């Protein structure tokens, strides 16, 4: 890594801090706050091998916001960091040290509050690898979490699934969503394996299972309610050593975001999620924007 470039980043920050002290007359605590925020930003830039503020793009800022959100920083802390970065860029523009403002197209903090919480893929892997598949409940819980992540289904939709809504041969599942609207959602290989194992080895051992048409049953043979599934997901996250709050809806968010990050088109994701309007699905493009922008930079002939 180019030490001169790293030094150049620090030089710009130093000039900005001097400006805040001399020109703006800000208090020591405010100066320290700006400095702390900007050092966090520089650390992020270096992790992405960005060694010059000229190379910062809007998707870099979006990626930074998501990174801070995944570190469980509060919205207020992230907003303060972005305000500090915005002030830095305004200073650089006024000093002709920056040609364009990467923050110009970034939405207001109100939008960030609406950004879905997404579970990183490495934590998904941890979450899906903790089950005791020698017990009927472990096998059932494994099937539930694999299905949640594989389909992006709402927790209420998963609780309502009937056994004949699943077609493992063709790898599809019927979902009944809001307003009783039905949709067909593909199942991935891992989810098919987990559900097949549950149907073959665990569900038949559950009390009164032969008398129920519901896919997921409690120990007593009653259909699992959505509240039960919330508790299952929460307990599985704790068992996996994940300290952050994890919910079924976060698995839905992660399903959509990870699909978009890996190149899925928005309309297909909309259909799988059961959104009536594509604008509802577009919130996930704000989360995965850094990936899409990178694809554009790599493949567009005029980029």
Which sequence ranges carry the predicted segments?
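Conserved catalytic core of the tyrosine transesterase superfamily
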Residues: 1-303
